[in-house]
């Protein structure tokens, strides 16, 4: 059972959740609710997790990450405060850099050292928060952190997450620090965190086409559109379509965009079969793909029996209402092809066929 908060700590917590006029900032300073020249604010995110906000971290940090930052800064008052508010004191060991701060963390209950499991748990927890402030600070505190360099399981997790995306570099040839940097950059694009995307883009321009690759793979058409029109892209349009089809199912927006730009929709159909992305397969058929014989052969080779059954249906046809649009505006495309709302005409036809077959 957690230790009850002291009245003083509870009062500070309550104060940090209120809107305070600038006329009363002196009260916040006096109470220690001040960080980087501005008030500390508390809020909860969509998952009901407590978030710390301040001038430098406007979109919010998790309590644990905020603790790691104040430990790095050797800010003893805020170390005590964030720990009292519920931050895991063991996460302080990720960034501790002075013996006096280490001693304070011990007094507050920190272990002598973190084991591999502790480090992995800290890493997993950091990935749950979807704000620019959080992702940027995760990169700054963790990507070059010695504690994270020699954990084999973590290396394996990051390696697998980047494996399909490493189309223009050899994964085995880059450092683990670079892998982690690409991981955080990719998360920024996956969650469409505009400020974080801009931060990574400006700082890591030498990560050739990484923003484009992630935009295609994670179905972030808004960012894909921006980067495609911002700079000269030296990636073949069919290679772009391959990324849109191969990473995840339901990548309708980026598949459609590549199709409108001239990508081979039959090749996209084959890629969807190879990667067993049924949603993408039906969408390619909606867009006029008709490589049924080659797709059937691939499905049989890979023993994808569900795909073999899907491809055995003979009455598929293009969705001409979709083909007639030929639009490139990302907002309109996203509205039309929202993964939760879009219904493939050909998938509905197959579902009817499948239901009739099962009732025979």
From Swiss-Prot:
Pfam name, any one: ASFV_360
Superkingdom of the source? Viruses
UniProt record, GO biological process: taxis
Coiled coil feature spans? none
Q: Report the function annotation for this chain.
A: Plays a role in virus cell tropism, and may be required for efficient virus replication in macrophages.
- What family is it from? Belongs to the asfivirus MGF 360 family.
Q: What is this protein called?
A: Protein MGF 360-2L
* Annotated organism of origin: African swine fever virus (isolate Warthog/Namibia/Wart80/1980)
């Amino acid at each position: 059972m957690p230790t009850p908060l002291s009245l003083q700590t509870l009062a500070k917590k309550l104060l940090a959740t209120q809107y305070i006029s600038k006329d009363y900032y002196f009260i916040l300073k006096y109470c220690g609710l001040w960080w980087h020249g501005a008030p500390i604010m508390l809020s909860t995110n969509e998952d009901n997790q407590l978030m710390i906000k301040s001038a430098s971290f406007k979109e919010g940090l998790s309590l644990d990450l905020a603790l790691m930052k104040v430990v790095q800064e050797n800010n003893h008052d805020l170390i005590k405060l964030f720990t009292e508010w519920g931050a895991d004191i063991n996460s302080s060991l990720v960034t501790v850099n002075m013996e006096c701060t280490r001693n304070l963390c011990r007094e507050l209950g920190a272990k002598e050292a973190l084991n591999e499991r502790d480090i992995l748990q800290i890493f997993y927890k950091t990935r749950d928060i979807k704000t620019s402030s959080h992702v940027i600070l995760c990169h700054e505190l963790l990507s070059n952190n010695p504690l994270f360099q020699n954990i084999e399981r973590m290396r394996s997790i990051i390696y697998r997450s980047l494996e399909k995306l490493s189309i223009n570099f050899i994964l085995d040839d880059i450092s683990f620090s670079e892998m982690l940097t690409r991981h955080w950059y990719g998360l920024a694009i996956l969650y469409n965190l505009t400020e974080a995307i801009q931060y990574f883009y400006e700082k890591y321009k030498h990560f050739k086409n990484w923003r484009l690759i992630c935009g295609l793979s994670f179905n972030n058409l808004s960012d894909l559109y921006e980067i495609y029109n911002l700079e000269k892209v030296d990636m073949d349009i069919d290679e772009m379509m391959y990324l849109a089809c191969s990473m995840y199912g339901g990548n309708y927006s980026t598949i459609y965009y590549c199709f409108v730009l001239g990508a081979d929709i039959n090749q996209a159909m084959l890629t969807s079969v190879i990667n067993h992305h049924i949603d993408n397969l039906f969408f390619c058929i909606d867009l006029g793909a008709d490589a049924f014989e080659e797709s059937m052969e691939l499905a049989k080779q890979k023993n994808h029996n569900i795909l073999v059954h899907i491809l055995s249906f003979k009455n598929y046809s293009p969705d001409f209402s979709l083909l007639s649009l030929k639009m490139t505006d990302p907002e309109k495309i996203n509205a039309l092809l929202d993964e939760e709302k879009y219904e493939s005409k050909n998938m509905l036809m197959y579902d009817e066929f499948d239901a009739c077959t099962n009732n025979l």
